Every structure is written in structure tokens, then in C-alpha cells.
């Protein structure tokens, strides 16, 4: 694969490569690959270990519970269970010593107008921290979302994992 541009930051050990299909951001102990076609990370490697067992993706679906019985059929009519992401534009710049990947995309079901329009930024620090900022606009013609999130399917052997689902505070 031929890379179009390569850029090192003034900060220690942050390297960014760009091709037609991906951005590769690497530092002293990490390498992250962002797929420009899907708008998601495909590889997150830290200390030589791949953390993902599948590429990341954005999702709104979850299995309905008994409490969802009144809205479940609306979710199914809206085809929320068949949602996929369409990526329109991606970019990567160096800002304040960090790599900033931007992505404009939408989530929609086949033959249905977009449910969500997403402007996402992924900020990667020279130490390997990934921060996300997303502006998500829901189409008012669709029912309430079951959920919205980024799915990261981790390796099965990972046992000690922390995450923040709805922010850093109790929810």
C-alpha cells in the first residue's frame, strides 16, 4: 500500500501516515489504524498486542427488553436492527501535538434515509490516549433510539477492562 503523506509531530514519537484507504497513527508503544471507508478504527495495537478482535463500529441497536414492548415494533419498522454506517468525508491533521482524525458519516438502514448524521473527531495524543468528540443529529422522523455508541469488540482473553458508558459520572 502506498502512503500519500507522512508527518511527524514536533512532539516525541507521534507519526501519522495517510493513504487512500487509511490513516495510521503511531507512537513509541502503539499503532492505530483508522479505515477511511468505514469511518472506524480497524486496529488498536498497544505494546505489540492487538486489542480488537473485530473493527470498531457505531451502533444504535440493542435487543429489546420487556420494558420496550411498546416501542419495539417501531424500532423494527425503522430497521434499527439493520443499521450500517456510510462515510462521506475523512481527514487527519496535527493540532497541538496530537493527531486529529475527522469523519463525517451517517447511520441508516438499507433503502431508508439516514437516521443519524455524525461529525466525529478522534484525538490521539503522543502517549496513545484516544479521545472522541461527536456531534450526532437524529432525524426527527424516526423513533427514539434504543442506544447509541461505538462498539469495540475486544480480544476474549482480556480480563481487566474499564470503560465509561454514559460519561465519567454515575448514570
Predicted regions and their residues:
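Beta-strand/loop-rich accessory regions of lumenal/periplasmic or secreted enzymes
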Residues: 2-171
Amino acid at each position: 500500500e502506498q502512503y500519500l503523506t507522512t508527518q511527524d509531530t514536533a512532539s516525541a514519537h507521534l507519526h501519522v501516515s495517510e493513504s487512500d484507504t487509511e490513516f495510521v497513527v503511531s507512537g513509541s508503544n502503539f499503532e492505530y489504524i483508522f479505515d477511511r471507508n468505514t469511518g472506524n478504527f480497524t486496529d488498536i495495537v498497544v505494546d505489540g498486542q492487538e486489542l480488537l478482535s473485530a473493527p470498531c463500529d457505531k451502533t444504535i441497536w440493542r435487543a429489546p427488553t420487556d420494558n420496550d414492548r411498546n416501542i419495539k415494533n417501531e424500532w423494527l419498522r425503522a430497521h434499527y436492527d439493520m443499521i450500517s454506517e456510510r462515510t462521506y468525508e475523512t481527514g487527519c491533521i496535527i493540532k497541538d501535538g496530537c493527531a486529529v482524525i475527522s469523519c463525517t458519516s451517517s447511520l441508516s438502514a438499507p433503502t431508508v434515509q439516514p437516521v443519524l448524521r455524525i461529525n466525529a473527531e478522534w484525538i490521539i495524543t503522543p502517549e496513545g490516549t484516544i479521545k472522541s468528540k461527536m456531534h450526532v443529529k437524529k432525524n426527527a422522523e424516526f423513533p427514539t433510539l434504543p442506544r447509541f455508541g461505538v462498539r469495540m469488540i475486544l480480544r476474549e482473553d482480556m480480563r481487566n477492562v474499564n470503560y465509561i458508558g454514559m460519561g465519567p459520572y454515575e448514570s
